[in-house]
Amino acid sequence: MQLTELSIRSQNLFIRDYIEEKKEMTTFFDYDIHSEHTWKKRYDDLMKMSFPREALADYMSAYHAKFESAAMRQNIEKIRDKRSVMVVGGQQAGLLTGPLYTIHKIISIIQFAKEKETELGVPVIPVFWVAGEDHDVDEINFVYTSGEKGPVKQKLSLHNVKKAAAKRIPLDQEKTEIWLRDVFSTYEESAYTNDLLVQLLRCLRKSQTFTDFFEWIVCDLFEEDGLLLFNSGDLGVKPLERTLFKHIVETNDEVTNRLNESQAAMKRAGYQPIIEAGDNQANLFYEYDEERFLIEKENGRFFISEVGLTWTKEELLKEVEEHPERFSNNVVTRPLMQETLLPTLAFMAGHGEVNYWGELKGIFEHFHLKMAPVLPRLHVTILERHIDKKLPVRELSVEEVLTNGVKEKKDAHFQQSLPDSFVQAVEHAKRELANAHGVMRQEALEIEPNFEQLLDKNAKFIEDQLQFVYQKVAQRVEEKEGYILRDFERIENSLKPLDAPQERIWNIMYFLNKYGPEFFKTFKNLPFSFQNKQQIVKL
């Protein structure tokens, strides 16, 4: 296994400037991630703050007991140490861990925590925030597998889910096992297939919900690393969140104003905000009849129009006090909850998260908080040996494929494969027939002027017939050189499937099935660098 790096620029201008230090970013962030002094400064700032360490450790101890992990228990006890801090990142609870970027983010969290623990000489705990409150089920109920014509979405069908949070979505054991076996039927059987399938079925048997299944698999993959899981949808954590929920209700209009101001500043700087939040949003969700609804506000009242609920501010504060388990954060307030509960040395973010966190600085200031340093996660591409060998044969580089895909080179190759004499003959036929048809058209219109539409259709028909012949010949050339076409398709499907980064489409199980547990152990411990470059792992 070999690790190399490539500099591939983001298409998002805000991310590009953030990574490349093109503009002063203090307007949007509290810390400069490029400064070597940032981590000590952030640590000193955290030591001046107060966190519910004992209550948090007690809760985490109870939640993680089911995993029976010594490494987890050790890190949970570190929470009680007032010197300890955390590296935090999160994601939705996708099936089989979801796209590869979830695995890459977890590796980022663990490796950066180890690096800073050595550098600062204090306990640094890796924490993965599981978005158990998320109710966008269609974003997590599938994986992609490889089909004859590229990636195929393998979806686990669900019934009567409504707007339930992931933590509440029950897993039908029988249906999920059938789905899992269907996924594995698309993989080539290897020496590792049976053991991996048994391991996943064991995780499934222990799971009641989507979130459970996700957590058991993550625990299996990273148990020895002591990764802690913070399930934001778990009812046990809600009493710890009560205080901030109240502050959000009490100063709701100011939260909205600060967001609007930050987004306006971002637009003035030439960037595009991505948070879609109207002035009537209260930035909190409320669970009613096992569904999750966004609370809105107007004229001093809070309401959920879909179910006819309404509160005054005082009534809503009372509801938070008595039933914090009914409330959850939205994209605006989740970072605030993280900052108040967890001593976060660094937040490990995807590019989209970097963008939206940049819209929240004013809200952090309103709550007298500093936003944790927002560090872009590792972006990794796995380059399999058979793909690596095909690249030079097809005159492609990894950088070229990741940046532009293969279509241009593929089309150029087949254009060159058509004999020039044939292409010229078709073009000549088009010109000659067009000229002949023009003469005929003129004669026909002198006899019957109303034939103009008929003649237009006739000309189009003749042109289409020539194009039909051209396409049939081109198709036959492609068939004769099918192995070349398949090379281009295999390269594309591996490195840039569906014109997207590999890590956004493929799932880790394909690689675990093909290369086994030792591959993953080596992979997750590679010496990745946090220099905001594309990490290329050659197998």
Curated annotation (Swiss-Prot):
Residues 249-270 form a coiled coil. GO terms for molecular function: ligase activity. Its EC number is 6.-.-.-. It holds the Pfam family Rossmann-like_BshC. The keyword Ligase applies. InterPro entries: Bacillithiol_biosynth_BshC, CC_BshC, Rossmann-like_BshC. The keyword Amino-acid biosynthesis does not apply. Keywords: Coiled coil, Ligase. Involved in bacillithiol (BSH) biosynthesis. May catalyze the last step of the pathway, the addition of cysteine to glucosamine malate (GlcN-Mal) to generate BSH. HAMAP family: BshC. Belongs to the BshC family. This is Putative cysteine ligase BshC. The lineage of its organism: Bacteria, Bacillati, Bacillota, Bacilli, Bacillales.
